[in-house]
Amino acid sequence: MEKEYIHIILADDDEDDRMFFTDAFDELKINTKVQTFINGAELMNYLNEDTCILPNVLFLDLNMPKKNGIECLLEIKENERFKDIAI
């Protein structure tokens, strides 16, 4: 039986920030799955897929190309499907 994990998504266009973020969670003694996206458009495309596994926690960079964190946040808050995601 597979252990439950905390599904975490980070949307950030800075490669170093994504690396530091994932490394920090790797060092924790909790079972996590960290998924990263390089911009808000990529994140929203994923979240809007029918087969998407919704995260428990979502971290958004405010300044990203294509779609910034504020635009993503507004779009997420408008969708009832995403109401249980901690942002």
Stretches found by the model and what they are:
Residues 3-5:
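Phosphate-coordination loops involved in phosphoryl transfer and adenosine-cofactor binding
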Residues 7-9:
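Conserved beta-strand elements of the Class I
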Residues 12, 60-61:
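Active-site residues of response regulator receiver
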Residues 15-38:
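Two-component/phosphorelay signaling modules centered on CheY-like receiver
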Residues 22, 36-57, 74:
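Acidic, metal-coordinating helix/loop segments flanking the phosphotransfer/catalytic sites
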Residues 36, 66-67:
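Residue-level signal for the "D+5" position in two-component response regulator receiver
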Residues 84-87:
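A short, hydrophobic beta-strand element within the central beta-sheet of small alpha/beta folds
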